[in-house]
Amino acid sequence: MNQEIMNLFNPTTPAQVFDQIRISIASPEKILSWSYGEIKKPETINYRTFKPERDGLFCARIFGPIKDYECLCGKYKRMKYKGIICEKCSVEVTLSRVRRERMGHIELAAPVAHIWFLKSLPSRIGLLLDMTLKDLERILYFEYYVVLEPGLTALKDRQLLSEEEYLRAQDEYGQDSFTAMIGAEAIRELLKGLELEKLEASLRVEMQETESDIKHKKLAKRLKIVEAFRFSGNKPEWMILTVVPVIPPDLRPLVPLDGGRFATSDLNDLYRRVINRNNRLKRLMELRAPDIIIRNEKRMLQEAVDALFDNGRRGRVITGANKRPLKSLADMLKGKQGRFRQNLLGKRVDYSGRSVITVGPELRLHQCGLPKKMALELFKPFIYSRLDAKGLSTTVKQAKKLVEKERPEVWDILDEVIREHPILLNRAPTLHRLGIQAFEPVLIEGKAIQLHPLVCAAFNADFDGDQMAVHVPLSLEAQLEARVLMMSTNNILHPANGLPIIVPSQDIVLGLYYLSILREGLPGEGKLFGEAAEIEHALHAKVIHLHTKIKYRWEGLDENGKQVSRWYETTAGRTMLGQVLPKSVKMPFDVINKLMTKKEISGVIDQVYRHCGQKETVMFCDRIMALGFYNAFKAGISFGKDDMVVPASKWKTVEDTRTLAKEFEQQYNDGLITHGEKYNKVVDAWSKCTKKISEDMMTEISAVKKNPKGGEAQINSIFMMSNSGARGSQDQMRQLAGMRGLMAKPSGEIIETPIISNFKEGLSVLEYFNSTHGARKGLADTALKTANSGYLTRRLVDVAQDCIITADDCGTKLGIKMRAIIDAGTVVASLASRILGRTAGEDLRDPLTNKVVVKRGTLMEESHVDALQQAGIQEVKIRSALTCELVNGICGKCYGRDLARGTPVNHGEAVGVIAAQSIGEPGTQLTMRTFHIGGAAQINEQSFIESNFDGKVTIKNKAIAKNGEGHLVAMVRNMVVAVTDADGTERATHRIQYGARMRVDEGDMVKRGQRIAEWDPYTRPVLTEVEGIIGFEDLVEGQSISETLDESTGIAKRVVIDWRSQRGGADLRPAIVIKGKDGKILKLARGGEARYMLSVDAILSVDVGAKVKTGDILARISTESAKTRDITGGLPRVAELFEARKPKDAAIIAEISGTIRFGRDYKNKRRISIEPVDTTEETREYLIPKGKHIHLQDGDIVEKGDFIVEGNPAPHDILAIKGIEELAAYLVNEIQEVYRLQGVLINDKHIEVIVRQMLQKVEVTDQGETDMISGEQIDKIEFDQINAKAKEEGKKIATGTPVLLGITKASLQTRSFFSAASFQETTRVLTEAAVNGKVDPLEGLKENVIVGRLIPAGTGASMAKIREVAVKRDKLILDEREKQATIVPSAPEPEPLALPTPEQS
């Protein structure tokens, strides 16, 4: 209590108002100005009296008193002596809190290098002096002397001399003829002697003169650091310390334990070592000890200071008494337990509790059940104040007693207090913002929190022992925000994809599905009913059944909102659903007059939300939840063993496949196919078999059976559960009653022998053993992937945290093009789904009438999208975060619709964090879901193209040949088949693979679903373009070709082997040539000879002397064997894309359009050049490693951006060759691909936001007449600013190219050093920032959390805006007053205007 009174007299200093924070190197003078006194002794506190020793590490004279307002000796006590310094013990009488603020210092007897600037790479001292780290360490740790002033001697400036060389030089030249020093003093002198202006000028000159690339880079680095020191006002010699600051004692406490021992912070030990060694050095210097001893002591001092700043950075780690490394100052900041992440970004909060959750089906959507005991504890302060207000208690003590006794009036007051006071529920792990939601508490008995079933999906909660935490928002503002922004009723849509997340699942779905079933031939079929009451009566009287087909008169509203009645053919159950539907024009009975699966219900909720608003949706959800639960209970659905129907056709299918597998085995034995092909084909056959059995099982289970009376029998329960989406997937049913199918090895390869049994029949021992792989891998993956996914989310949040909506419209004309994504003939993502909720980037016109359908700048709602679909528009230009031109943040138009609200996005919305959560959250979900299918292998390989539309075929770059078998074969790589409709609009374009069999020709009409082309997905062919006779070149047995006898078959097959590794094979160039009748090599139409180069591992399909027709296969190259894909391959893939890593076998991409020419080969590289079509460009050369299959031949024509060597393209190449839009499309599609495989929907805009953050930097290619350095990476914004300035001054501007940074790199290079330091590599970031004297503008979220302010997003953004307005207005008023004061000096003083506070405004 008296603490509070004291605080009244000592008002806390108001919080400083600042806009930015600067970090720089502390000069010795600065350190002394912070200090309150020098620490001379290593003692801490007296172990008997527990009082701090004078001049020691805890000295009260320097740091302040231990008890409030009491000096150490006790002469002065109490407030009245405030500020007096006791003459006996020299301690100032003040608050003990100053011991957290006051610093001390240690005067070093010899200067010491700061290890961060020495060892944190790149070494700043090393760069400035242009010395290697090794040499620096030799000088600093007293091994070598360095020459500072060579004088007239033959020594060079900065030459290193060992002890003997130094002594010899002194003898030779005389002691005073040159100056050489050793240790940190020497380095300090060198740094002091640097003339930065001159150095910078000479470096710039040198850079322009140098030819070598490496040297240029090194000079650029030096120039950058020289500039940094010049502009930041830091002096280079400050990197050498002469004074060491000592942090306040309360930040490195020493606590006495019982038994006379002490627990102490490691820093005290480290400081003690420094002080001991420093004092010893001082004494030795006073005693004029021999040089060698002093030098050793100086080296030890340097090591002690190194350990204090960053223990373990150099040399041995210094350990404490228990062999544990001591935590140095750097370790205090670093890592998860460091100051940044533990205390500044993650704080513990008061007023919280946690308990187990149970289900609360009778709650409303905005409620949760809170145990009375918890409520009483959490709302204590409110209860106390209420008791006081009601006069039931006069003091807090009394109130406490009342509450502890749990008097009846306390419960009444608790009810009052809780009413309309929202509380927050949180379930860890909080992967996205829906992991914390606000509810109104309902008091319940018991000890478990009750949760509404519909919000479980958002929390990812279930009731198998999950726990949740409760938090109480205290202030009125916090309560308001909780109610308006976080209430569960305000979070109906998922921020990741805009679909409802308040969706019934499991029992509710099953109940609703059961309710909406329609079965033929039930009693009472065809009866007419006028209203719901009649139906209810009939049901009770058992005249009709829930599923009976009846006629029903439904009363609704027509388009004009008038009452209308219509007859519907429906069932009794569906009329019940009709009762809970909101009455609206847009909600006819048709919406629910169908079989309700989970997907359908989700659709209905979505429609209700779009047409009837939020309130109706919430009420509707609550009603259908009750209906679903009730009917699931009434239906009493359960299943027995016989409900799992094994299809009758199973064994026949299995036998057929076995025969097929045997055939492939035989073909392999006969040498017709390779081992790899056989493997692929067998695996393929079995997966087809599994699929067929699965389909047969589904048809048998779902078949409508008749009962003896001629009516329909009950529907199979398992089918009902799976079909409704309540529980279980088709895959799980297949494993129960079909066949388990193929299994994967832990390495990801598929085992050739499948598991033929299902769980109903039971597995054989071998099958069981084979299936253990998948199950174990699943469990192991789960553990590993959770961590990986969490780390990915953290990196994403870090890179995107300062992406905030800061304006309505940036006014850009740019945008990106969107079209539907089609894969293997199926539409994977429709154009409609991709452009919904985005802003049109141009006027969209109907291709037939040329009428504008959607104006530029319109936010596309559902109605617009429908109009576009009807007009048949295939491609739409939309605004995107990638092309937004705002300097800070993103504008609302470029972002589009706020997915979680379904409205245009608000100012201050933290879209970056939402994007990161949306991408990261399913990562964890998926990783936890790998083993749901028990590792059953799923293979997907595309091997054909189907038309999605009816239309006419047109072929671009046509080159088709008829081969020996009479099939049409595609002969080029850039052939495109387009399907056009009647009026000539292109509906679809397909790139045709080389060697594909064409099923259509130019001008053919195709129907939807008709095959256009097909190919073997497992091999790549080499085709002949001319008819003739085969000849071999350089195909030498044992050198470039090996005829392998397959052990199992005894049949020879010829494979090209690596000829460069064989003796005498370096100059071979194996190829197949086509000769004419005269034995000469034929010429090709496109120039060049008919010579086909072969790569390693090619399998020959022809023999010397054989006749071939155009389009015949000469050789085949096998592709990789099929691996299973699941998100375990997926998560690393997503990380790889976001980190912009170069893939393992990167594709080589043509940088220009032109003709391929093969050059001379190197030892193990093959040289290819492209002769450009455009003669102004120069020829590009590529060196391709051996063993890579180049599927191009001499003289082929390639387009810019085509692949020369297959593989995954490196994102950097795409950016360089095709530009930003292509890169964005590639990244978005590749990432979406991974998530789509798992059935996860994420809106493209989230990925675009992250990609925008990866493209923030520009690499300067030509510096022009600016201060930038060519080759350096600089922020896009800074780059533009510098260029604008140069333009104003009429100088030549710099040019640059956009650079793609991975998310980790981008996070570390943000403009805010606070954000970067709290992310990773804290030491490096802080060192760099200090050298550059960086200023943190505090724009992002993290920086503001760290300095303890409101974040500039959400309500914080509007507060900041109001404050800005207020400051401007105040300034105007004050300026006005000053003017008046200067005009009329004699006038009486005006009344002060009442300035409204920012809050009022």
UniProtKB/Swiss-Prot annotation:
CDD domains, per database record: RNAP_beta'_C (cd02655), RNAP_beta'_N (cd01609)
- Binding locations of Mg(2+): D462, D464, D466
GO MF term list: DNA binding; DNA-directed RNA polymerase activity; magnesium ion binding; zinc ion binding
Q: Which UniProt keywords apply?
A: DNA-directed RNA polymerase, Magnesium, Metal-binding, Nucleotidyltransferase, Transcription, Transferase, Zinc
Q: Does the keyword Magnesium apply?
A: yes
Give the top-level enzyme category. transferase
Give binding positions for Zn(2+) 2: C810, C884, C891, C894
Q: Does the keyword Amino-acid biosynthesis apply?
A: no
EC code = 2.7.7.6
Q: What does this protein do?
A: DNA-dependent RNA polymerase catalyzes the transcription of DNA into RNA using the four ribonucleoside triphosphates as substrates.
Family that this chain belongs to? Belongs to the RNA polymerase beta' chain family.
- Under which name does UniProt file this protein? DNA-directed RNA polymerase subunit beta'
Species of origin reads Rhodopseudomonas palustris (strain BisB18)
* Gene encoding the protein: rpoC
